[in-house]
Amino acid sequence: MKLKSVFRSVLKYRKTNLSLLLLITYSIITLLYIFDHERYKLNLPKEDEHPEFNDLLETAWGDLQIITASFHPYTSKENDKVHDYLLKRVLEITGNSSFASVSDDKESERSILFQQQDPFNESSRFSRVTYFESSNILVKLEGKNPEEEGLLLSAHFDSVPTGYGATDDGMGVVSLLANLKYHIKHRPNRTLIFNFNNNEEFGLLGASTYFNHSWSNLTKYVINLEGTGAGGKAVLFRTSDTSTAKIYQQSVKENPFGNSIYQQGFYSRYVRSETDYKIYEENGMRGWDVAFYKPRNLYHTIKDSIQYTSKASLWHMLHTSLQLSAYVASNSLDTADQTPACYFDFIGLKFFVISAKTLFYWNCIFLLVSPVVAIGLYLISRDRMTWKSHSWLSWTRFPLSLAAGIIVQKLFSNDIIRSNPLTFSRNYFWPISAFFTQVIFTSYVLINCSNFFFPCADMKSLSIIELFIILWTILLFTSKLLYSSDYRYTGLYPLSIFFLLSTIAAILRLLALALGMRTRKRLGRECRDHHSNYSSHSQIDMERDGQENLEQPQDQFTSSQDDQASIQDDNVSTTSAGPSHNVDEDHGMDSSSQQHDERVPLLKGSNSMEEGLSTRENSLKLEYTDYAWIIQFLLIVPIPSFILFNSVDVIMDALNHTVQEGSKATFDVLRFGMVGSILMALPILPFFYKVNYITISLTALLFLISASKTLLVHPFTNSNPLKVRFSQNIDLSQGNAASVHVLGREGNFLKPMLQDLPSIKYSSTHINCTSVTNGMELCMYDGMQPNLLSTNGNTNISSMVKVHVLHNNRNSTERSPYEPIVAELLLDVKENRACTLTFESRHQAKSPVREITVYQKKNSAPQKTNITKTIKSASGINELQLHKLDFDQETYHIGVQWFPKLLTDGNLEDDKLGTKDELSVSISCYWGEYDSESVVNGTAVRKIPAFDELINYAPLSFSFTNEQKGLVIVKDAIIL
């Protein structure tokens, strides 16, 4: 009996037990979180256990060190060195293999001219034409069964001008080399193509060029390796459909990492980046986009270097891609299910996949069946008189306390916006923690205040039922979203899991009521509200000498019945579950209770029905209901809390640094934090009113710490810097001033930093800072002149870009007024690889340009030839982007054809000034090398000293990236 008493004391529903269980639950969630984020670092292959994998990793790490020795954007000479190194490594690996072939676009002088939607801005209506000279390196491994659809493995080897490209995309490139080395030794069944492509950063151009190669017809599937962050684990960022997600599930058995929440966020454009996977997907390929995704404030900066990453990160991407490619290369694939997939991993141990369409069907079943079952059980309990109606005050406590918590949260978010809107960039834990504790603390205070004045015994069960109703409404809304998005809202699955588990908990309570003992007379009220018509003077005695009242199992379902103190502490009144009787262990009904309670039946035979129930049946009910609160807790709290916490962490981990990219992103992150914290709080709210004073004191303390950290701590540090975008602009049409543009978030960050630069501080240079769109600030000042060329005389910036008009028949008398106008331009640009031409007419709303021609010089042996590429567009062409490989070829030869105004609007008005058909052409040319020197008059000087000054003198809480495809932009303009 003593052991039984101890056992019952440990498991009964009281404050200490609940608080301890909450502590255990959140401790386990924390340990799982740490395990998930640290485990991959311990799984490096050992030479004695996995010599082949160890060799692949060590070789890849060495390749990465060489590739990332310097900045190597497409616009730099270092880009050619990386290309040549990769070509050498590819030839070394393939050797004399009989089934391997190598194709070098640079050697074959492959180029394309095509019309391109802005890949980084799908909403853009700007019509763009792109000319690109490729230096992709392709390798074909012919499979044993070449008739099977092939697999493409792709990564880009260019970096941005301001980053070494260790994770973007050096790790992807060396992982491809490792995959190539592995598959050379283990010949695949299906054909594999490896695409080491160039110039992903400024238009996804290497991937676009792939489809100009004959080998592109051999591949149906693609594994794209990318870096949109700067380290950590490589995530399955997105995948084509349920079939490809299941292939990942079947292949990546060690350390799988993926979540369809990333996929939904990426497609919803919460992340302003793109990868080559977009191009492959648009061209009908199916596959997997595996990428590094954090931290974004180091992405595209000088800290994207080998110093800020690790072998563990490299091995995670390499091993993931190797498992996936080996499986796809050697197995027949079931690809029938092409609906979008919902997927997630459990701490890197297990990967789960379900079709989003299937999830929608299950949601519909849940939405239809659960209320039917709940209402049915409610009607049964009403019929059996085991359900007691509750006052409106009892029913409104939980939703009103939740609403109050949301209001408090909203007020606090206003304080964040006013005082520290970028706090998420430094550490999203503190604002999320503040939001979370606000909701649960507000709920605790309001519910307990209500219970003090108007006690409610079964608050927990009422809250669980109301939680079920709230989640049913949420699931209805999210299911509608899922359906209307053609099942592409793949990040909503946590709500389905939460709803299912909370529904089971609510149904269990209703089932217990429905199966409860029938009574003819209710002897008490479950909720003794202030508005009761009468009050009960009977006192319930739930336990005497360890014996339980067998006539009230439903009371034990919801609260402790072990001693009088517990009853008073919990505000217990047993009529919620059915009849309430005071039972003496020897004499049944207490005589004094019968004498003083006028509600006691006058006829002794009135309880014959209850007495007729078998002792075995009552014992079984008692055994089931005694610990039901624990079952409810285990259903509602641990699993939903872990899934929701992990989901919120996934979202914030990927998006918290996007607050630096504009006010819209800031409000998005703030909104996600608020909604996420509410969802994290929902599982514990039905129980939290019951916690002990230590728990609620710790909650209040955590809120105070979190709020102070959120509102008062500076958002940027050395490890979490503010990313600022740099460019130096020289507009030749307005002089030779080298105007430095520094773009970053508003908030008095940029100007104080710039004012401390020596060139500004000691020369009284004026800094002009203005607000631009989306909460960004642009600061401009005249900086030091760049030294882009080596020269023996004075550097003349105006000689960097010269425009020659070779032909223009706009004013020719031989041209009919209805005939398109034709002009030819020769751009003389020194040591350059990228220029952009923008076309505009002052007299026409849309660009009148309908045709572009690029005259290309071919240097292939045996003799040079001229190639003409032409593209036409009926809707008009706004922009021509030019990318060439040869630094020594100093000219771009362009042909432009545009319609006169007469053809576009039919207006026959006189043009006395002869200007209505003029075409304005703006030219911008880009240089991206800054970490190198030029020799001017025999002296070595830095190419872009203005950028060097920022790097050297700005506080460590700033990091810098390029604003455009080059760090220096020289502009000019002409009128044709």
UniProtKB/Swiss-Prot annotation:
Location relative to the cell: Vacuole membrane
Location (main, coarse): membrane
Residues flagged as site, Transition state stabilizer: Y299
The EC number(s) this enzyme carries: 3.4.-.-
TM spans (from-to): 16-36, 360-380, 393-412, 429-449, 462-482, 497-517, 628-648, 669-689, 693-713
The protein's required cofactors: Zn(2+)
UniProt binding sites for Zn(2+) 2: D168, E201, H300
Glycosylated residues (UniProt): N96, N121, N189, N212, N217, N656, N768, N796, N811, N866, N937
Catalytic machinery residues: E200 (proton acceptor)
Source organism of this protein record: Saccharomyces cerevisiae (strain AWRI1631) (Baker's yeast)
First and last residue of the signal peptide: none
Protein name: Vacuolar membrane protease
Membrane topology, Cytoplasmic segments: 1-15, 381-392, 450-461, 518-627, 690-692
Gene3D superfamilies: Zn peptidases
